Amino acid sequence: MKTIFVFLTLAVLVSSFFKKLFLRASNIMIKSISEGKSQFSGPALSPNIDPADEHIGHSPEDMKIIFCQQCAFHCIEKKKNIAHCENSICRCTLEDIL
């Protein structure tokens, strides 16, 4: 009879401990989720920045560099060296990379 009483008492204590622990963890998660939503709800524009300046495109030199980088990656995937990258034409060598 004593063992049943002790077992039930321990079961109640353990279950109440886990219930408090679960509630605390869920409150922390809810708080962090709500903070996360408020952080990413929309970026506030600075008064010193003109919104028209935010979406400036790439210059032609930047576009050539980006194209040549993509060309180099393409050649490397084929296990070839890059022969040349001019006027939006990508050429890889015939020899394999050693």
Curated annotation (Swiss-Prot):
Keywords: Antimicrobial, Disulfide bond, Fungicide, Plant defense, Secreted, Signal
Listed transmembrane segments: none
Endpoints of the signal sequence: 1-16
Gene Ontology cellular component list: extracellular region
Biological-process GO terms, alphabetical: defense response to fungus; killing of cells of another organism
Keyword Protein biosynthesis: no
Disulphide bond pairs: 68-85, 71-90, 75-92
Taxonomy, superkingdom: Eukaryota
Major location category of this protein: secreted
Compartments, as annotated in UniProt: Secreted
Family: Belongs to the DEFL family.
UniProt protein name: Defensin-like protein 219
The organism of origin for this protein: Arabidopsis thaliana
